[in-house]
Regions:
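C-terminal peripheral helix-coil segments that are non-catalytic and often amphipathic
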Residues: 1-13, 140-144, 148, 174-210
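Amphipathic alpha-helical packing segments from all-alpha helical-bundle domains
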Residues: 122-163, 181-194
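Short glycine/proline-centered loop/turn elements that form peptide/ligand docking sites
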Residues: 45-47, 69, 149-150, 196
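Hydrophobic alpha-helical connector segments
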Residues: 75, 86-114, 161
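Basic, helix-initiating cap at the start of DNA-binding domains
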Residues: 1-41, 45-54, 71
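Short hydrophobic/aromatic patch on the recognition helix
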Residues: 55-66
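Secondary-structure edge/capping motif, primarily at the C-terminal ends of alpha-helices
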Residues: 88-91, 120-124, 172-176
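Alpha-helical DNA-contacting segments of helix-turn-helix folds
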Residues: 38, 70-80, 124, 131-134, ...
Length: 210
């Protein structure tokens, strides 16, 4: 008769937990340091030694989690993606003001740290990730809203909206539009969503009456 005996003492799990915590702390320090550098300089000034000095880490630690500065910039882009996702979490997607409220939340996020964010958007676009890297969260917000109105045309309408959205962000990043211009242009994109909803509502009402 065999016995199943647990010989583990929990040290392996503890080591994994410590490693995960160390990674989270170190990567956060690197990301914060990168933003500090980008506020005063450009992405061309990012290096493991510079980030390490600002973050209070060793170069080896920076290299461990970000072997290249490209990966660090991508981490900043991912941070924007999460921010875009969170921007719509508490909004009522059925509300008539949802598109504008979402846009305003996105603009507030971008303008909270505009100089690094401009560079992150441009570099992520030029380094193989495209605008999708910094705006992926937006598609997760817009497409479900469209699908609730018209599942058949939702993907096409969302593609149009996202194209306009990304184009506006890229123009802001490349041409340094004013804060007011960014908000105004993104609100125009929001108005496209509102107009599309109205068209679908009218079509639905018309088919119902028929």
């Amino acid at each position: 008769m065999g016995f199943n005996v647990d010989l583990s003492d929990g040290r392996g799990e503890s080591r994994r937990e410590r490693a995960a915590l160390e990674r989270a702390v170190a990567t956060e320090k690197c990301i914060v340091a990168a933003r500090v550098v980008l506020r005063e300089h450009s992405v061309f000034d990012l290096s493991a030694s510079v980030v390490a000095r600002v973050a209070g880490l060793t170069r080896q630690t920076v290299y461990k989690y970000f072997p290249t500065m490209r990966q660090l910039v991508f981490a900043l882009a991912d941070e924007l993606t999460v921010g875009f996702q969170k921007a719509g979490v508490d909004l009522d997607v059925e509300g008539p003001d949802w598109p504008r409220l979402y846009v305003d939340a996105v603009v507030d996020l971008l303008l909270a740290d505009p100089i690094p964010n401009r560079q992150v958007i441009l570099v992520s676009a030029s380094q193989g990730r495209g605008m999708a890297a910094a705006t992926a969260g937006t598609s997760r917000e817009i497409l479900p809203v469209m699908e609730m109105r018209n599942p058949v045309e939702a993907e096409r309408a969302a593609w149009l909206t996202l194209t306009l959205f990304r184009g506006t962000l890229f123009t802001w990043a490349a041409e340094q539009l004013s804060d007011e211009a960014l908000r105004a242009d993104l609100r125009k994109v929001a108005d496209v969503v509102v107009a599309q909803r109205e068209i679908w509502n009218t079509a639905t009402s018309g088919s119902g009456e028929a």
